[in-house]
Amino acid sequence: MVHDLLRDRADLEARWNPSAYMQFARLRQRPVVELLDHIEPCCPERIYDLGCGTGIATELLARRWPLAELYGVDSSVEMLEEAARLPIKASWERANLRHWCAERPASLLFAAAVLHFLEDHGKLLPRLLGQLTPGGCLAAHMPNWRDASWYRLMLDALDSAGPGGASLGSPALRYRLHRRNVLSLDNYYRLLAPLTAELDIWETEYLQVVDGNDPIFDWIKVSALRPVLGELDEEARRRFLDRYLELLHRHYPRELDGRTLFPFRRVFIVASLGR
C-alpha cells in the first residue's frame, strides 16, 4: 500500500487526479445539491463555476439554468479536460482563483469546495462580491475540516513521525496546514452582512458512509493531503504514511457491515446583492 502511494508521487505533486476525485462523486455532489436548493429562483444571465474540477457542479448548474452563459474555472488542466467531456454547453477557463477576475460581471458565482484552499477570506469574499451584477449572488460551500479527526491525525503524524519523534516537512508546510482559512459562521456574518441585501449562512455535518480498504485516506489523498505528499521526500513520505494510516485505521474502524463512517462538516454561504 505505502509503496503504491510512493509511486504516485509525481501525480500528487503536480496534478489533480480526476478519476480518483470522482471515486466519491455521489457524496461530493450532495453539498452541491444542498447549496442549489438555497438559491432563490431566478434566471441568471451569466454563471461562473469557480473551482469547477470535473464539472460535478457545472453539470447541475447547466440543468437548472440551461439558457445561462456558463463558465467553468479551474487551475488544473486535467480537471478541465475531464469537465470538457460533459454533454453540456459551457466554456472552460484555466485560472488561479487567487488572482482571477470575471471578464464580465456575473449573475451567479458558484464556488463548490474551493474557497477553503484560499487564504484571507476577509479580502477574498468582498472581492468576489465586487464581480457580481446588481442582484447577483455568491453561493459557496467549503469543507470545515480544520477540527476534523482525520485532519488532526494528519498534523499529529507530520509533527511526530520523523526519526526519534521529530517533525517532518518544512516549518512553512506545517504553518500552512495549521492555518485556518475557513472562518467561523459569526465572522462570515460580520464580514458579509454589511455588503449584501440577503445573507444565508449555515453548517451541515454529513455522516458519510464509505467503502474500501482505506476509504478515508482515498478521500483525503486527492485534495487535503496533496501538499504534504508533494513536499516530503521518499523516506519522509514513507514514515508519514506508515504513521498516518495506522492512526486512521485506529480512529476510523470498519463497521460490522464492512463499511466506514466518515463524518464531514461543510460551511454554506448564499450572499445576494441588492438590485
Curated annotation (Swiss-Prot):
Keyword set includes Cytoplasm: yes
Stored Gene3D superfamilies: S-adenosyl-L-methionine-dependent methyltransferases (1.10.150.290), Vaccinia Virus protein VP39 (3.40.50.150)
GO cellular component assignments: cytoplasm
EC number: 2.1.1.144
A biological-process GO annotation: methylation
Top-rank taxon, per record: Bacteria
Pfam families: Methyltransf_25 (PF13649)
Function: Catalyzes the S-adenosylmethionine monomethyl esterification of trans-aconitate.
Family: Belongs to the methyltransferase superfamily. Tam family.
GO MF entry, a single one: trans-aconitate 2-methyltransferase activity
Keywords, comma-separated and alphabetical: Cytoplasm, Methyltransferase, S-adenosyl-L-methionine, Transferase
Primary site of residence: cytoplasm
Xref: SUPFAM superfamilies: S-adenosyl-L-methionine-dependent methyltransferases
Compartments where located: Cytoplasm
Organism: Pseudomonas aeruginosa (strain ATCC 15692 / DSM 22644 / CIP 104116 / JCM 14847 / LMG 12228 / 1C / PRS 101 / PAO1)
Protein name (database record): Trans-aconitate 2-methyltransferase
Gene that this polypeptide is encoded by: tam
InterPro entries, per database record: Methyltransf_25, SAM-dependent_MTases_sf, Trans-aconitate_MeTrfase, Trans_acon_MeTrfase_C
Catalytic reactions of this protein: trans-aconitate + S-adenosyl-L-methionine = (E)-3-(methoxycarbonyl)pent-2-enedioate + S-adenosyl-L-homocysteine
